[in-house]
Amino acid sequence: MSSSSVVDHSPHDSAPSPLVPTASNLILIDNYDSFTWNVYQYLVLEGAKVTVFRNDQITIDELIAKNPTQLVISPGPGHPGTDSGISRDAIRHFAGKIPIFGVCMGQQCIFDVYGGDVCFAGEILHGKTSPLRHDGKGAYAGLSQDLPVTRYHSLAGTHVTLPECLEVTSWIAKEDGSKGVIMGVRHKEYTIEGVQFHPESILSAEGRGMFRNFLHMQGGTWAENERLQKAAQAQAANTKSDAPTPKKSNILQKIYAHRKAAVDAQKQIPSLRPSDLQAAYNLSIAPPQISLVDRLRNSPFDVALCAEIKRASPSKGVFALDIDAPSQARKYALAGASVISVLTEPEWFKGSIDDLRAVRQVLNGMPNRPAVLRKEFIFDEYQILEARLAGADTVLLIVKMLEYELLERLYKYSLSLGMEPLVEVQNTEEMATAIKLGAKVIGVNNRNLESFEVDLGTTGRLRSMVPSDTFLCALSGINTHQDVLDCKRDGVNGILVGEAIMRAPDATQFIRELCAGLTGPVPKSAAEPLLVKICGTRSAEAAAEAIKAGADLVGMIMVPGTKRCVDHETALSISQAVHMSKKTGSTEVSSQASKSARDFFNINAEIIRKRGPLLVGVFMNQPLEEVLEKQHLYDLDIVQLHGDEPLEWANLIPVPVVRKFKPGQVGLATRGYHAVPLLDSGAGSGTLLDLESVKKELEKDEQVTVLLAGGLEPSNVVETVKSLGPLSERVIGVDVSSGVEEGGKQSLEKIREFVKAAKSVR
């Protein structure tokens, strides 16, 4: 191009365009290039709110936490594979989530990320202006052909290695009309574009138009962008000065659009299609559920607690990325939460349906467990069915997001699956909608979803509209016990707390202070005396003597061919001796305790302790039918499985099951099956367990309690248990067989000595 045709296309009017709502948090990655300023200038002039980070001054997690609306990768020196810092990782993460635009090296990063080769372009082009041909789409929409654009590069992506997922969008035409060096690429599915030239150069024509087109792109895919653009155009066409507030606005609109695209895509995956989910539900494989309303009304606190699991939010970014959902849920449950709310939205809240599934699993077998809430942007019956199959007891329906017809349809569908939804409102209009719907549980969001401002008085002001039999929850901004007292004063029945608990160093202590106003460490319950099991019993006399000495469990061996196996008549006489000694009295627990969740092993230990003395039948690798027959025949109170029997057998046996494990064996801490795990070195081997391995086992799960067996005798039982240190509190009982024998026969004196010694431990 001759010097006479050189035109200065730089912005002569420095007044920026009106802010683009969809470009409110654009992040520009600076690859240490002077042109980055010009890119920044053009973006701001076209209405974007831009923050710049150099490519080695921010981590990917920090970048994710910024929750950008768009991502722009700047030009830069060097090769994208070695000199682009975080740029390529940023493209990988945000691809399919938000619009991405790459300039010069930025385009080369896109090319490289998807497997193309970036190499020498055939000539060094620094300041060369060339006429650009383009496809008129995306960033080039509405722009003329043969635009003069300026090039500053010696590298470029090659035609022969063009990744399958990318298409060429612009090029410098050769004299024969064929396509020359690639000047632009676009991802075929994701909202990603790149240009090799510099639209921000003063010698490039219509550069601002390219940036303007990019800033108005929305969503992570072209399909999503098209849908949102049509929706925006339709809304603009129908907008009147007196029009009501749209149902979906600002961040809600963005999240809704993203989730809609994700759900639509998921429905196409074999095994996750709507028909697949319905087939699974028809087989009744969804976990058992409980009533949301009943669980909320059965709270240990004056104001019921819905404790939330979320790692991030649109307003606060990432704040608890490393917390795992099931561990946190167990803390919530045992601290008194009535509901556990699980965020399952992956991009803005960093959750997933797998979090909910894991939370439900960790609550298995827990008496008075909390209800599980799927907190998600629900707009489709598919999401509700998916939640039920994962173990949810309830789902969230946000009135602001849903037209009444859809809201009512989703509400009724949830009820058809046995789930009373939590219906979220924010103002009087939405509250009236929820009441019209017939919602039994209504949550008032104290946070304005458009401004993110919190007003704790919102719930109280809406209380007068709520029927007396409707459960009312405050959903945001609760941080202190005084906040809870204020809610109670305003007639609020429950609170939902998320970020404050997730940030707390000790979730259990935080809940105690928040809900009950109690400070200081959680008091420990007095340690119960050790349970004592005398096993290998071969006479009614020995059984009676063991019970007289204070034994809680009397075991007899039911394994044919073993030296301690008893015959039919002896088994009957032992059974009679044990059952004639049964304790009498109430086994009720306090009404306060019944309102809190209990760990499965903890409650079973209490039940066994209250019902003793109990008769235990020991089996090893025998048919289930034989176990069931002998349990009935000898009126066994407990069945002990000492072999390789499946865990599931415990649910087929009509009495509690004690199951033998070695330290480190899989399944020991699995809830909902065996009532108590028994740690043993071997079947009557008389060999002491390796106590270090016992400690490691107990340290894995702070709620697991065990019976201890193997090599115990009157002279070492006290020392063995106490050598476990603080972990000894988790040993609820000891089991002895050969340790109370002399000459292969049970010694009544040793039985008495063992019981006395064991009971002296605590």
From Swiss-Prot:
MF terms (GO), sorted A to Z: anthranilate synthase activity; indole-3-glycerol-phosphate synthase activity; phosphoribosylanthranilate isomerase activity
Occurrences of domain Glutamine amidotransferase type-1 (ranges): 25-224
Region (Indole-3-glycerol phosphate synthase): 251-515
Catalytic activity: chorismate + L-glutamine = anthranilate + pyruvate + L-glutamate + H(+); N-(5-phospho-beta-D-ribosyl)anthranilate = 1-(2-carboxyphenylamino)-1-deoxy-D-ribulose 5-phosphate; 1-(2-carboxyphenylamino)-1-deoxy-D-ribulose 5-phosphate + H(+) = (1S,2R)-1-C-(indol-3-yl)glycerol 3-phosphate + CO2 + H2O
GO terms under biological process: L-tryptophan biosynthetic process
KW Isomerase (keyword) present: yes
Keywords in alphabetical order: Amino-acid biosynthesis, Aromatic amino acid biosynthesis, Decarboxylase, Glutamine amidotransferase, Isomerase, Lyase, Multifunctional enzyme, Tryptophan biosynthesis
EC number(s) on file: 4.1.3.27, 4.1.1.48, 5.3.1.24
Location of region: N-(5'-phosphoribosyl)anthranilate isomerase: 531-762
Pathway: Amino-acid biosynthesis; L-tryptophan biosynthesis; L-tryptophan from chorismate: step 1/5; Amino-acid biosynthesis; L-tryptophan biosynthesis; L-tryptophan from chorismate: step 3/5; Amino-acid biosynthesis; L-tryptophan biosynthesis; L-tryptophan from chorismate: step 4/5
Domain of life: Eukaryota
CDD domains on file: GATase1_Anthranilate_Synthase (cd01743), IGPS (cd00331), PRAI (cd00405)
Cited Pfam families: GATase, IGPS, PRAI
PANTHER family named among the record's database cross-references: MULTIFUNCTIONAL TRYPTOPHAN BIOSYNTHESIS PROTEIN, MULTIFUNCTIONAL TRYPTOPHAN BIOSYNTHESIS PROTEIN-RELATED
Job description of the protein: Trifunctional enzyme bearing the Gln amidotransferase (GATase) domain of anthranilate synthase, indole-glycerolphosphate synthase, and phosphoribosylanthranilate isomerase activities.
Protein's UniProt name: Multifunctional tryptophan biosynthesis protein
Organism of this sequence: Neurospora crassa (strain ATCC 24698 / 74-OR23-1A / CBS 708.71 / DSM 1257 / FGSC 987)
